[in-house]
């Protein structure tokens, strides 16, 4: 059997400080340190509400063709061809 000193010596987590003092969990951080963009999230939600309340009947509707989608995909970099080859 190992003595108490040997057990403590081989315990990697026992360095004189308790584990909860060494590592502070992410959710224990307070204020803007934990969630720096928290205010930005509220602004985004209000912007989305403003956009959704637009008048659907008066909005312009344009026909979108296959070539338009191909050009858009090219601009977003999701295809392996040059934009002028679309």
Swiss-Prot record:
Segments for region (Disordered): 40-60
GO cellular component, one term: synapse
Database matches in Pfam families: Pro-MCH
Tissue distribution: Expressed in testis but not in brain.
GO terms (BP aspect): chemical synaptic transmission; negative regulation of synaptic transmission, dopaminergic
Location of region: NEI-like: 52-64
Region entry Melanin-concentrating hormone-like, spans: 68-86
Region (NGE-like): 31-49
UniProt-recorded Gene Ontology molecular function terms: melanin-concentrating hormone activity; type 1 melanin-concentrating hormone receptor binding
Family of this protein: Belongs to the melanin-concentrating hormone family.
Protein name: Putative pro-MCH-like protein 2
Species, as recorded: Homo sapiens
